[in-house]
Amino acid sequence: MTAPAHEAQSPHQDLHESTGVESRKLAMWAFLSSEFLFFGALITNYLLYSGREFAAGPKPSEIYDIPFTSVSSFVLLMSSLTMVLAHNALSRGDQGATRTWLLATAMLGSVFLAGQVFEFTEFITLENMTLATNPSASAFYVLTGFHGTHVAIGVIMLLSLFGLSKRMDGLTDRQFLNLELVGLYWHFVDIIWIVIFTVVYLLTAAPGAS
């Protein structure tokens, strides 16, 4: 189904008086800002422990599978592209393409999550590195697990939009804002992972890093 393209400003949007920005979008930006600070604290916490030596068990940086995690990171990065394509499709009123790209984004996010579950399983069963092995392992699992939870929430939101579009034969002007908010959230999750992958995986696993 193809519907008229959405205009830049929907009449249903509730603008914040002082900023001229839609109130729900402003709230999302505020939420993401607080999450950015929280992730920053978790990354800092991991870095504080990553350079220390512990008697018990391996440190995460000693057992990373960088090629595998690189593929997972690429998959998540591509999901940002499909999210943009979903937004653009709805902007021009192409409801069918919107559903296709929403589903593609959710599937790519699910593949990333499956990769993370596989990585955790390998670390626990083969490398005997659990949450309680040492502070470095604990910091790693908390950081990456917290990010994985955000990805899972994003996948649920994407599938909800996909299901709503199927049930109503398209997304309305009001729901266009919902897609924009989900898009903001999803891009944030992707950017945070790029930071985590670079700082936590690549830099700490580099020769001489710890």
What are the language-model segments listed below?
Residues 1-210:
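...captures the hydrophobic TM-helix bundle architecture rather than a specific catalytic motif
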